Swiss-Prot record:
One of its GO terms (biological process) is methylation. Residues 1536-1556 are annotated as: Disordered. The keyword Oxidoreductase does not apply. The active site is at 791 (for beta-ketoacyl synthase activity), 926 (for beta-ketoacyl synthase activity), 967 (for beta-ketoacyl synthase activity). Disulfide bonds: none annotated. In the C-terminal section; belongs to the NRP synthetase family. Residues 24-423 are annotated as: Adenylation (A) domain. This is PKS-NRPS hybrid synthetase ATPKS. One of its GO terms (molecular function) is phosphopantetheine binding. Residues 617-1049 form the Ketosynthase family 3 (KS3) domain. It comes from the Eukaryota. Pathway: Secondary metabolite biosynthesis. The lineage of its organism: Eukaryota, Fungi, Dikarya, Ascomycota, Pezizomycotina. PKS-NRPS hybrid synthetase; part of the gene cluster that mediates the biosynthesis of pyrophen and campyrone B, which represent a class of fungal amino acid-derived alpha-pyrone natural products. The first step of pyrophen biosynthesis is catalyzed by the PKS-NRPS hybrid synthetase ATPKS that uptakes and condensates L-phenylalanine and malonyl-CoA in order to produce desmethyldesacetylpyrophen.
């Protein structure tokens, strides 16, 4: 690398000649009132920091300290730490940071170098702080404590010290490890610090808006970044305290609490934070790492957490760092750009530059280089050399081996010496070795790094007295008194001699494994110690562990201690603080500590909290609420409206339930009668949207409405919280549902004739299914349980859910309760015991209370740990502070309320909430309205709360929602909680109805209680206005269970449901660009109603709503269902108009597009470029802007003018004219395309295949992973320069003609040597390139035939003979330096027009041919279509390729397609990224919306990062409910003979119109030759079909080797497993065993299962293997698994196809059928119009009638059998008959009324065909058709149309 190259052009005089003090003075003058340092609860402003440090400096000067003197700082991490540093510097002195924890010997070595004048120490801590440590500093100099100096500072005048500080003055001296056993003091001067800080301000960039974390010790060079970078630019330093340093979670809390935006850390610390669960923080935008190598894996994880990640490089001797590299995912991590005034050289032993690509030693020169080593001229002379390339400068010999990969990229590849870096600390092995050999018993020592652990190999002196003492016991204390802790080896290994190499040096690789030398003591066999041993073994990587071994002495360190913490917390289910792990560092101590903690917890629960309630856990946030209650209440908002308006929701018993008059009797003793005629009923309780949850009508009829009510309510709860199926499925979300009395009445079931529901009724009515059905339907994997606690059930469920969250059993939970009243059983029972209300109304605490009114309903809340909810920005409705559950014990009777029990449960809840009775404002009482229960409850409340009430606090207010909605039993407790949360939100307490006269049985005055007889404002407490509102909720069960919960008002910042900004709340402000408003549903009608609900919401919103919040929430918090629309609008008026159009006119047809897009990305070539292309995108999207800037920097060295100055120049300007030059145009096109791809990629859009036109193919190759970005840029630059250098006598013309016509014309003009075909763009458009005069003649030739031609605006002939061999050689030279990488995406080559084979584009020769040969774009488009591409996204400045591509694929191509999904050009989609006639962002946003409509998964959260928006509450899904429950059921207890109960029959269910489905499609599987070895795992070596398989493998270049077990094939390309078994169970067992073996072995070659007849004809055993394999590929994604089915006899042709399939790694499932290879493809089919088929009915096909069902089955071999009729029918008639049969039998399995309700294209699983239905269908279809079908019928054929197609092929003998 030539030292004068562009890499080293870093001169910047503005950053030179400064000192720290003067720069700080400038900063503090500007930012005096701003916070400079935040430490714990202390904040120091810039003004205060300047004033205090001035006083300290003046004090030091008065004590004789002056310029050039040295002051040692041995300080703890107190808030004044930085002030003391600045004070020393302002006095002109130099400071030496001393870690107070260092051993005395080390401190002595450091301070011996110095002529110390003063040592400043922290006062000795009484709490175990470092204080003055173990060293007597008074032996070296005058010693003062910080407190002494601060006392004296008070008497100093407030003035600036008059000291003339020079840039060359030494600011501080840092000591690092030395090779002789003595540390080296590195002298860093002021100018170096200032140049460094000013450089970082520029790159990576630090501003006065940043808050920078300071966590390093000041003796570590990274502290220079954390202190000086922020303080010299006006930023705020957030200083971590000592207890924060070791605990990553404490650091994470610190970052969150103080809104840190910027931090620097070693990779080790960052790994520890990630392992502790850190995933970034809002506002934390920049992360800098250094001190050790940053791995690509860690870099990738970090870039997912932070907007920018930078890697810094630089030794301590060069002031922290000398270069910065911005980390990009997928790119190498290099040294980066040198700092200003810094140069980097890679030199050989003669100090001469080495060539690019060669290795040398890295030397660093410039303003940051230290002055040398303190008082060590020999070492200084060896390491700090005069710079021969830069006069007057010194260069530092770094010891790092480095290599310039090209002129701008520099990488470190190793060390030239033995220096070691472990967890960011630099260690010279000689330093440690010298300290070891200083021991009298040690003759020699070698120290090495093994797996990030220091190992010392030692030879003892013979005959020493310590021979029996273990080496570690002898040396560890010795070294701990002499070396820092990080330099003490983890392992000490005693050897007799050191192994040597041939040249006599120690052979480090031959030294023994240190683990093998450890002899651990036996671990006792207790469960806990064995569990600890397993965890330590896993983390340390070895099992040589004894009970008393220190974790840190057997390989543990600060990074691995975090892994221990994580695993322990998972094991124990409770927090384990990191400091405790440092304190208890042996298995014995740790086991004792953990056991004590467990016992302490148990004792506390038994003695202090007998109710067993959590008193120490984290608060729980209620992040969503949902309900379905009497009075047509479907939302919490409707509940609040009913409560505040005083609505009475009680009605007479609906006739569809039972005849209240028929069972009425005023006598409570009348058997089978009830005196109660009313209650709280949910009008539509029996209605349900079964299709939404994938439940068939047949199953839905057998499901208790309690299950369907709670299922829909839980869904709405999650949806209101902003969580859809994508985030819920597979999550650790718990489900806790409360229930009470069974909904199901045996009499009703018997009357309904339930035999037709057998198989569904058990689950449909089981209480356990209440929770299980919710978890199953939503895919939740946390703890799931149904709790029966009577009327207390939902509050008990909430209590259990909170406990599960606190114990870490789940991350989120839904708690709910539900009751359904289908029969009068409870009315009769409660009438007999005289607690039922005659009219169904509850009158809580009223003088005329007459019993409870029974009701029904569902309520649910979604819960999270409060910290998690705040982290995730969830909307918090309320905070559950604590809860408790108990039982009243043995009282007067089981049903009598227990006053003592109620008091105990309230007090336990208060204890759990860490609150006192006076903290509670209101109690939502159980309040059923019984004459016994209400006084008992009031008395219990009075005893708990009355003593805490006074004239200031006022009485405790109580009320009950049962007065409005009756007693909803299992749902009641949560209904009360929801009421209280709403009351907190509205700061209003609703009245309790029917309570004009409070009960005289209650002492209201003495008990200091107040019944809310009217609505009352909930005002802040007089004695504490800042206290949040708090309330308790009572809920008691009839069997004696008591529950109480205490909830608290959330902070307003987390409870603002509106989400509107305070400074921008105009909900009809016009936006700069239209925003997308996403709506979706399962059906078109649901989608229309969804639009109606949104329209109503926006119209009736009481608070103004920002459109950006609406758009964001619709996109990111809603599940996106199959039918989709996107409405684009810029203001509310426009959005409302578009919604009205949907409401009035219905959903457009595009919403029903059920075809999933297969995306191909097209990268355009030169000629499409234009001025300002992409500039509009850069202004709006950060990813695009950063990518463009980054790539433009890579082109800087090869272009005369900065690329962006040309790309984004004003049109017609001089700079813009440069775009007409190829050397600018091609880099510009490439830059734009890669930035567009990164933008698409950031939004989650991934292409299935890519294609590039001309230079666009380089961008496509980069996207496909074939070359990295830097290499691609070099290739583009070379190509552009080459083509710009072409003769200007060339020309190009676009002709309206086919390639044969143009070729013929060239021949006729005798111009074959002067003109070439440059591009075949479409079948009828060809571009010719060549000599200008010939091009003109060619144009005239076609114009004479009335064919259009267009001379292109270029004076050069691209892709022609003008590119001669000499010019192409230049391109080849560059291409040969490219390091090609493994292809990650399919790419179509425009050199061949075909799909590129692996490695085809990975050669210089290819790219030379690509520049010269014609562009076969038209053929490439055909290949894309053959690959199933149906959605084409162009990445370029215009829509050129889309237009040409549409011409290529014009017409219906489905006849010739080889791949599924092609339905002709009319179904293809062409999308643009940019369009010159439209706003840049608008074009790409519209295209993104189109992809969403076509089911492409979009990361909408990423899209809105640049737009903004907050999560707000929006309307939930528009359920399409229908009546199912026991269809045909009549009310019992009825004297009336009227028939059907009201409601729709299932035949009113919506009819789906289409669905994505799987079909088998032929692909091209041409035989390919490749050298490889394949193992054959065969059932029998003499199987008749083995011979052709082996022969075909040999012909294809694949060596077959018979193996007996998988292990023999580990080194082969793969193994073919052939299956044959007579037993299905035996086959599945063996298959599962094999998969487990493959997983356990981490088997990397391909495992290909070969079955025979598993698909189609239905070999039952082998068909089952397909299901096993499909499950395995999901379960073991890391394995290479495939399956192939061979139909019919295996011959050489079949075997050859099998060999071809082995080369097609992208097809996991294939079927060989004769000469064809079939693969499954997703496709969309329109619904077939066939006649209804039902069993025992007639099938009408083309006017003919044939019997079906039982009649046909009676004579299966007769001429009238259905089987014979379909075999005799023609193809079209047969297809109709089979479709009708499948449709009818599917209708029967589903239980729908007519076959017309079956959508032939909707998946069996989607509509609810379960395993029972599939078995019945297979049985009936086989009986009707004579076709043997596979056992896994509905998996092989996922929908009716694919099943009927398969039947037809089987019948036709295919």
């Amino acid at each position: 690398m030539v030292p004068e190259d562009d890499q080293n052009l870093t001169d910047d005089p503005s950053k030179l000649g400064h000192n720290v003090v003067s720069l700080f003075d400038q900063t503090q003058t500007r930012y005096s009132p701003k916070a400079a340092i935040v430490c714990g609860e202390h904040t120091l402003t810039y003004g205060a920091l300047a004033s205090d440090s001035d006083r300290l400096a003046c004090l030091l000067l008065s004590r004789g300290i002056s310029r050039g003197h040295v002051v040692a700082l041995a300080l703890d991490r107190t808030p004044d730490l930085i002030m003391f540093i600045l004070g020393v510097l302002k006095a002109g002195a130099t400071y030496v940071p001393v870690d107070p924890a260092l051993p005395p010997e080390r401190v002595n070595q450091m301070l011996d170098d110095e002529a110390l004048r003063l040592v400043i120490v922290s006062p000795v801590s009484t709490k175990g702080g470092a204080g003055t440590g173990r060293y007597d500093y008074g032996n070296k100099a005058v010693c003062c404590t910080t407190s002494e100096l601060q006392d004296q500072m008070r008497y100093q005048a407030d003035k600036r010290p008059a000291v003339d500080i020079q840039p060359d003055d030494i600011a501080y001296i840092l000591y690092t490890s030395g090779s002789t056993g003595k540390p080296k003091g590195v002298e860093i001067h002021h100018a170096a610090i200032c140049n460094y800080a000013l450089s970082v301000h520029q790159r990576p960039g630090c501003t006065d808006q940043d808050r920078v974390l300071f966590k390093s010790t000041i003796s570590f060079d990274m502290a220079a970044f954390e202190i000086y970078v922020p303080l010299l630019c006006g930023a705020t330093v957030v200083q971590a305290q000592a207890h924060d340093i070791r605990d990553p979670r404490a650091l994470m809390h610190l970052i969150d609490r103080h809104s840190v935006t910027f931090s620097v850390a070693t990779p080790t610390i960052l790994q520890m934070m990630l392992d502790s669960g850190w995933c970034g923080t809002p506002g934390f935008s920049k992360l800098v790492t250094g001190g050790e190598a940053l791995s690509p894996r860690l870099a990738e994880r970090l870039t997912a957490c932070v907007e920018e990640v930078w890697n810094l490089y630089g030794p301590t001797e060069t002031t922290a760092s000398v270069a910065a590299w911005k980390v990009q995912v997928g790119e190498d991590i290099l040294i980066g750009t040198p700092n200003p005034n810094t140069r980097l050289y890679v030199l050989d032993a003669d100090l001469q530059p080495v060539p690019v690509g060669s290795t040398g030693e890295l030397y660093i020169s410039g303003a940051g280089v230290a002055r040398g080593y303190r008082n060590n001229p020999e070492r200084t002379k060896a390491a700090f050399l005069p710079d021969p390339f830069w006069e007057g400068h010194t260069m530092y010999k770094s010891g790092d081996l480095a290599c310039f990969l090209d002129s701008r990229r520099l990488a470190v590849i190793g060390r030239a010496d033995t220096q070691i870096k472990i967890r960011g600390q630099r260690i010279d092995p000689g330093d440690v070795e010298a300290s070891i050999t200083a021991h009298a018993d040690i003759a020699n020592a070698v120290v090495v790094n093994r797996d990030e652990r220091l190992v010392a190999y030692c030879i003892r002196k013979p005959g020493v007295g310590s021979a029996e003492v273990p080496l570690a016991k002898l040396l560890r204390p010795w070294l701990e008194d002499r070396l820092p802790g990080y330099m003490v080896p983890s392992f000490f290994v005693e050897v007799d001699r050191f192994p040597s190499t041939l040249n006599g040096k120690v052979d480090l690789r031959a030294l023994p494994d240190p683990i093998s030398t450890i002899t651990p003591a036996k671990i006792p066999a207790s469960t806990l110690t064995q569990q600890l041993l397993a965890i330590w073994t896993d983390v340390l990587g070895h099992g040589q562990i004894g009970m008393q071994d220190s974790f840190f002495h057997i390989g543990g360190n600060s990074a691995s201690i975090i892994q221990i913490q994580t695993k322990l917390e998972k094991l124990l289910g409770r927090p384990v603080p990191v400091p405790k792990l440092y304190e208890h560092f042996t298995i014995a101590n740790l086991a004792a500590y953990l056991s004590d903690q467990t016992q302490t917890n148990e004792v506390t629960e038994e003695t202090k909290n007998p109710a067993g309630n959590d008193t120490t856990g984290e608060d729980i946030a209620v992040i969503s609420m949902a309900c379905r209650l009497p009075g047509d209440i479907h939302t919490p908002e409707e509940l609040w409206k009913a409560l505040i308006s005083g609505t009475d929701a009680v009605t007479r018993v609906p006739e569809e339930r039972w005849d209240a008059d028929a069972i009425y009797d005023p006598d409570p003793e009348a058997r089978g009668k009830s005196y109660s005629t009313g209650g709280g009923f949910v009008r539509d309780a029996m209605d349900f949207d079964a299709q939404f949850f994938g439940i068939s009508p047949r199953e839905a009829r057998a499901i208790d409405p309690a299950q369907t009510m709670i299922l829909e309510t839980c869904w709405e709860g999650f949806e209101r919280a902003g969580y859809g199926t994508k985030s819920l499925r597979g999550s650790q979300t718990g489900v806790f549902i409360g229930t009470g009395n069974s909904s199901v009445d045996d009499g009703q079931l018997s009357a309904a004739g339930t035999e037709k529901f057998e198989g569904h009724l058990g689950l449909g009515t089981a209480p356990s299914s209440l929770s299980g059905r919710v978890a199953y339907a939503l895919g939740l994997e946390g703890p799931t349980m149904t709790l029966d606690a009577g009327c207390a059930a939902s509050l008990v469920a909430t209590h259990v859910a909170c406990s599960a969250l606190r114990q870490g059993e789940c991350d989120m939970a839904v708690a709910g309760g539900v009751t359904f009243l289908p029969s009068p059983g409870l009315h009769i029972e409660f009438s007999r015991i005289r607690v039922a209300s005659p009219d169904g109304r509850s009158r809580p605490f009223s003088a005329d209370a007459a019993g409870m009114g029974l009701g029904e309903g569902a309520s649910a809340v979604v819960l999270k740990r409060l910290s998690d909810a705040q982290r995730d920005n969830d909307h918090i409705h309320a905070i559950i502070r604590g809860s408790a559950v108990n039982h009243g014990g043995r009282g007067a009777s089981m049903t009598a309320p227990s006053g003592p029990g109620q008091k105990r449960v309230v007090r336990a809840a208060l204890a759990a909430a860490r609150l006192k009775p006076y903290d509670i404002d209101y109690v939502e009482a159980h309040g059923t309205g019984t004459r016994l229960g209400d006084p008992v409850e009031a008395s219990a409340l009075a005893e708990v709360f009355s003593s805490s009430r006074d004239d200031i606090t006022g009485p405790l207010r109580i009320g009950s929602s049962k007065s409005n909605i009756a007693h909803t039993q299992a749902a009641a407790g949560l209904a009360g909680l929801i009421k209280v949360a709403l009351a907190m939100q509205h700061t209003m307490l609703p009245q309790t109805l029917h309570s004009s006269q409070p009960s005289p049985l209650i002492d209201w005055v003495g008990g200091k209680l107040q019944l809310l007889q009217r609505p009352m404002a909930w005002l802040p407490r007089t004695n504490d206005p800042t206290a949040p509102r708090r309330a308790g909720i009572n809920s008691f069960g009839l069997s004696g269970t008591n529950a109480h919960a205490i909830i608290e008002e959330p902070p307003r910042a987390h409870s603002n449901a509106n989400g509107a900004d305070d400074d921008d709340n105009d909900d009809n402000a016009r936006l700069p660009l239209p925003l997308p408003f996403l709506l979706s549903a399962y059906t078109s009608e649901a989608l229309r109603q969804q639009a109606q609900k949104l329209c109503n919401h926006l119209s009736s919103a009481t608070a103004q709503t920002k459109l950006s919040d609406v758009s964001y929430s619709l996109a990111t918090t809603r599940t996106h269902f199959p039918r989709r629309i996107i409405l684009a609008a810029q203001d509310k008026t426009e959005l409302m108009g578009r919604l009205a159009s949907i409401i009035d006119n219905g959903v457009p047809a595009t919403a029903d597009n059920n075809k999933t897009a297969r995306v191909a990305m097209l990268f355009s070539g030169q000629g499409t470029e234009r001025a300002r292309m992409g500039k509009g995108l850069a202004e709006r999207h950060l990813v695009f802007r950063n990518t463009v800037s980054h790539i433009a920097e890579l082109f800087e060295s090869v272009l005369e003018k900065p690329l962006l100055d040309v790309m984004w120049a004003e049109p017609e300007s001089e700079a813009a004219s440069l775009l007409r030059r190829t050397d600018y145009a091609q880099p510009a096109i490439f830059t734009l395309q890669v930035a567009l791809w990164r933008l698409w990629q950031s939004w989650g859009v991934q292409p299935a295949v890519v294609l590039g036109h001309s230079v666009g193919e380089i961008a496509a190759a980069h996207v496909a992973g074939i070359m990295n970005l830097a290499d691609a840029c070099r290739l583009v630059a070379a190509r552009g320069k080459l083509m710009h250098a072409l003769p200007e006598s060339g020309s190009m013309v676009a002709l309206e003609a086919g390639v044969d016509e143009v070729t013929s014309a060239i021949e006729q003009l005798s111009a074959r040597d002067r003109v070439s075909i440059a591009s075949i763009n479409t079948p009828t458009q060809v571009v010719a390139s060549g000599e200008m005069d010939v091009i003109d003649k060619l144009a005239a030739y076609f114009e004479a035939q009335n064919r259009s031609s267009k001379i292109l605006k270029t004076s050069r002939a691209f892709h022609s003979h003008h590119l001669d061999e000499s010019m192409l050689a230049l391109l080849r030279a560059v291409a040969e330096t490219i390091v090609f990488q493994e292809q990650t995406l399919p790419i179509v080559s425009t050199v061949t027009g075909k799909l590129a084979e692996p490695g085809q584009l990975s050669s210089a020769d290819y790219w030379v041919r690509q520049a010269r040969n014609p562009v076969l774009f038209a053929e490439g488009m055909q290949t894309l279509a053959d690959q199933g591409a149906n959605c084409f996204v162009e990445l370029g400045p215009a829509s050129t390729l889309c237009g040409m591509g549409a011409s290529c694929l014009d017409g219906d191509l489905s006849q010739t397609s080889k791949v599924a999904g092609r339905e002709g050009a009319k179904n293809l989609v062409w999308l643009h990224s940019l369009n010159p006639k439209s706003d840049d962002a608008l074009v790409i946003h519209n295209s993104l919306s189109d992809l969403h409509i076509r089911k492409v998964e979009i990361d909408w959260a990423a899209f809105f990062k640049d737009i903004g928006g907050r999560r707000i509450q929006l309307p939930t899904y528009a359920f399409q409910r229908h009546r199912y429950w026991l269809d045909g059921l009549r009310p019992i207890y009825s004297d009336k003979s009227s028939g059907q109960p009201s409601g729709q029959s299932p035949s009113g269910c919506p009819q789906p119109t289409g669905q994505i489905q799987v079909g088998w499609h032929t692909i091209d599987a041409s035989s390919q030759y490749s050298n490889s070895t394949w193992g054959l795992l065969c059932p029998a070596s003499d199987a008749p079909w083995m011979s052709p398989v082996k022969e075909a493998l040999l012909h294809a270049g694949k060596q077959p080797v018979t193996v007996n077990q998988l292990a023999e094939a580990k080194a082969m390309s793969g193994v073919l497993c052939f299956w044959e078994s007579d037993s299905e169970d035996d086959m599945i067992s063996k298959a599962s065993e094999q998969l487990q073996t493959v997983s356990r072995m981490k088997f990397s070659p391909w495992v290909v299962w070969v079955t025979r007849g598993a698909v189609g004809a239905g070999n039952m055993g082998e068909a089952s293997l397909w299901g096993v394999m499909r499950s395995a590929r999901v379960k073991y994604p890391q394995l290479c698994l495939r399956i192939v089915d061979l139909e019919g006899d295996v011959n050489i042709a079949t075997a050859t196809k099998l060999c071809s399939i082995l080369m097609m790694s992208t097809e996991p499932e294939c079927v060989v059928l004769g000469e064809r290879v079939l693969v499954p493809r997703m496709q969309f089919q329109m619904q077939a119009q066939v006649q209804e088929v039902q069993k025992h009915s007639k099938l009408c096909v083309n006017g003919q009638e044939t019997t079906n069902g039982a009649t046909a089955a009676a004579d299966p071999n007769g001429t009238d059998s259905f089987e014979n009729k379909i075999r005799m029918a023609g193809p079209e008639e047969r297809a109709m008959m089979l479709q009708g049969l499948v449709r009818g039998i599917t209708a029967k399995a589903l239980g729908v009324a007519t076959a017309e309700e079956v959508d032939m294209h909707q998946g069996f699983m989607d509509v609810g065909v379960g395993s029972l239905g599939a078995i019945q269908m297979r049985k009936e279809l086989s009986a009707q058709t004579g076709v043997k079908l596979p056992a896994n019928l509905t998996r092989v054929y996922p929908d009716p149309i694919s099943l009927s197609d398969a039947l037809q092929k089987q019948v036709e003998g295919q």
